[in-house]
Amino acid sequence: MIRTRFAPSPTGYLHIGGARTALFSWAYARKHGGKFVLRIEDTDLERSTAQSTQAILDGMAWLGLDYDEGPFYQMQRLARYHEVAEQLLRRGQAYYCYCSREELDAMREQQRAAGLKPRYDGRWRDSREEPPAGVKPVVRLKNPLDGEVTFKDLIKGEITVANSELDDLVLLRGDGVPTYNFGVVIDDLDMNITHVIRGDDHVNNTPRQINILKALGAPLPQYAHVPMILGADGERLSKRHGAVSVMQYREDGYLPEALVNYLARLGWSHGDEEIFSREQLVEWFDLSNINRSPAKFNPEKLQWLNQQYLKTADNERLAELVKPFLAADGCDVTGGGTPDLRKVMNLLKERVNTIAELADAAVYFFRPLEPAEELRAQYFSAEAKGPILDLRTKLATLEWEGHAINDAIKASATAHGVKMPKVAMPLRVMVTGEAQTPAINAVLELLGREETLRRMDRQLEYFLS
């Protein structure tokens, strides 16, 4: 059975790069009827926080990336890492190193001065010296001194690294906490991970991890290293490119299915398909369709995708999503006589890019907005006064339907010898405080007769003054 995993470090929020890695691992497992495992690599004691762990869990839940096992925490598995380290020590495949930080710094400085690559020189590898008192040693792997490591990356192809390029990496630190390379290998082995799908910033770690597995006589998983994500300027993705946390996109009013769709298309493709469901992603997903070149993050494309999903979203769902945004804007959407929020969503959803914009566009349905003086000056003209007063009379008694409202606007314009916009635009500004809205008869129909007339009367003083 195929088993994949996502193993973030809880030192920050779930960002775009991590979310895409999680999505690819999730999709591959789901495609093949396998298992998707979540593991929290919390061995960075200074930077790991419970808040970051929760942010990762929340981000995955919002994106719908459900896991079959976990979350497992590395700090709860220390005894297991010690057990394996002891096994390697007994076999002579690992050793204690008593070098101080100062010694290591001096060693690297000398190597740089000699034009050499800084690396551990193996001085404790076969040492028979008496260990210095009071020093907590690290445990190092006896990396092979010759030969090479070759593995087939499912995205990048065959990769070969000479063992002479690798030094004796640390397995356990002096405080007994495993290093990244050791912990991840033991976890993947114990959890029977068959496919390690991760960012290509881990490619250089792979030969080291393979040598640990070989020392243990353990089977190797298959590796797939996903190219990094760049900003539009070709630089590594950072906050200045809009690479905020996944949950920030929720706060900004993006739909999770739009972000999932966008993340999937960042470096992976299925023909020319731009928009596809989660089910289609699982059906089509294959590692062979991941591009070897870095993907470029395009906020405008993400916004466009979100707009497409908003257009077809269920109105009741949109109404629930928009409520917190409207409440933050001082709108009561539950009071008696307020417009049906679902109908408001239906009227507005094709005009916006995000839930936040949808809320902004809906505000005037739930509280009056005072028109800017420039709008009053532009539209509250002497020419409009007569038809507006006439329309006010008509609106007080007609059947409150969109077509009847439209007919009344047209009739008032005709009766006063002006074109329809000369009536519709002042009316729009009076009632909504805006110059751009959906068809004004549709707006008035949802707003209701009583509220429409109240708002008109409030603005009529500017015509009559």
Swiss-Prot record:
GO biological process: glutamyl-tRNA aminoacylation
Compartment annotation: Cytoplasm
Primary location: cytoplasm
Segments carrying motif 'HIGH' region: 8-18
Annotated CDD domains: GluRS_core
Chain residues that bind ATP: K239
E.C. number(s) listed in UniProt: 6.1.1.17
Keywords attached to this entry: Aminoacyl-tRNA synthetase, ATP-binding, Cytoplasm, Ligase, Nucleotide-binding, Protein biosynthesis
SUPFAM superfamilies: An anticodon-binding domain of class I aminoacyl-tRNA synthetases, Nucleotidylyl transferase
Family under the similarity heading: Belongs to the class-I aminoacyl-tRNA synthetase family. Glutamate--tRNA ligase type 1 subfamily.
Name by which UniProt lists this protein: Glutamate--tRNA ligase
The species this protein was found in: Nitrosospira multiformis (strain ATCC 25196 / NCIMB 11849 / C 71)
